[in-house]
């Protein structure tokens, strides 16, 4: 079998005939199958191969079954690696990026992926940037984007800001450098405006998205209901607080309010800036040290300092000390927490560390802290009530007395989208001393190409002819915004643009007719690591564009498949570990079909896949067997018709196994509960080939191959196209119905019981009479019945025979 030339032959045929372009007929049933677009790093890895093989199998199956399939591919082509390559290799980021895209396109073709070429683009293309900048301006004008100065996550290595979601355990999501805090101006997208809708709409995705992803998004949004109220600054401390009269806090445990013995505020809280002037030099030094620590460092060890001021408890009127604590977060709630050591692990640990008093407010004084809800004591009029009852009554009291109010809080923060780098989509805003921040009118704002990338700061800041411009409103001298957009903006709407052919999107982001027809994406495939980054942002962006009038849908992805990682020797493949498998080498040695077959057979999509060279060789041998056995079949110019009546057992088994595989194929591709277990489908195909190989009835072989090649076409397309063309001609190769007669069993297995207790099984002909079955059953149970008196014989058709004995 010359797999290299066979694969090359059909790849050329597919591209020449535009075999994978969707039709413009909106009356056809459609399927939009999409794998997450890759970053053009230069060469694809086995993780790419797995992701795109899964998607391609789905796309090819639905095409074969007469769906109008959109299966596009593009490139998420802005980002820091291109700048790093520019520094390392002395090559322009644009040149590096587009050379890599060209190389990856060839690799995709070599694997036989059936992508639509007429939808392809890179997110760094100017015509893509143009509409992204238009969206940015529309969002700004609608009030969904704002700009403010704040302490931000800063990656010292990449020299850029990171969103909260891009900080993983205190480190940069891309380069793993420890993140620090830095105060900068930043543009924010108001994702918090959509927190409730993002949370509520997760319900519609249940049974369609992995539960783990839904839980991760729910936890990240972090909805909580509680009491918001204030501790008034003690009169003698007001001067030190420079006009700040109250510390506002939020708590989900209003029932523990009588247990407050301190207030913890974030180092960034506005109160600190004023009160720090009156504390000792040692305390001031400690507070400043906390300010300079990373979130990861703050999580490792609790630290704090007494700020020297007190606030008044709203119920007891006692003075409560105010502490700066590194576990209080400025970007959550009001940046202030009430410390209840008797009822909270963190508060208890902090109180013990700094010898802060602990007030017990539950009936059980032992084994502090009491984090579970209990009956209260030392809680005023709410003593002797359960925590849940007291909580509701205390909130009602605060609202009645205008001391506070019930509020909903979310852990989710607004999405900071400014990045201090060159290779990104320019933010289309102008800074004018007379007009303020003004949107650019000439789009797209493109990047200058005559830049120097040396790794020191943002190159756009140093590019005078690009940076200095005129205000589009008053035409006076102004400054262009030098920050570029977070690349997650590009990946938040690319799936919408794919819907529209290239020749119809020059003057529009996407065509409404194509959009309404193809959206939402029917099946979306990518790694679970995108659960609270890309997937959450894409859901938000879809809703925001809907509210701008661009869309008429709420959710972009109907079904989600999160494929597991590809491992070797139990670890994720990486160059540093020396366990990388090169797709190029695999294609050269075994071919694309063997690689695809192994990928789908080795593990279900959601599970991790352990690389196995011998299993890959086994996949290669299976394809060769399939090919070689086909040589025994005389080509036919029409669909094979099965007319045999009298068959032996081997022939019946051959037909049965083939149609069992066909039935499983429909289940695997069409039923979500199957979890796309291609491994079980391929195992069925292997059984079917074994059964066909055991007999030489040419009609059965011909019929069997007609069915088997249809099942395998989505998995090993080159081999399937080659054999189906040779044996049947492609124009005759239409989906075949399941022959239910072939699945009928000649025998049935009955349970044999005595007085209801199972003793044996009996395999009998399915047409056997009751009398024949009773005789055979008695013979099978002879040793149990020889000395017994049978009182009654009960036959339950197709299930069991029971003998009642004395």
Curated annotation (Swiss-Prot):
Keywords: Aminoacyl-tRNA synthetase, ATP-binding, Cytoplasm, Ligase, Nucleotide-binding, Protein biosynthesis. GO terms for molecular function: aminoacyl-tRNA deacylase activity; ATP binding; leucine-tRNA ligase activity. CDD domains: LeuRS_core. GO terms for biological process: leucyl-tRNA aminoacylation. The keyword Lipid biosynthesis does not apply. Its EC number is 6.1.1.4. ATP binds at residue 575. One of its GO terms (cellular component) is cytosol. It holds the Pfam family tRNA-synt_1. It comes from the Bacteria. A motif ('KMSKS' region) lies at residues 572-576. The keyword Protein biosynthesis applies. It is found in: Cytoplasm. HAMAP family: Leu_tRNA_synth_B. Belongs to the class-I aminoacyl-tRNA synthetase family. This is Leucine--tRNA ligase. It comes from Helicobacter pylori (strain ATCC 700392 / 26695).
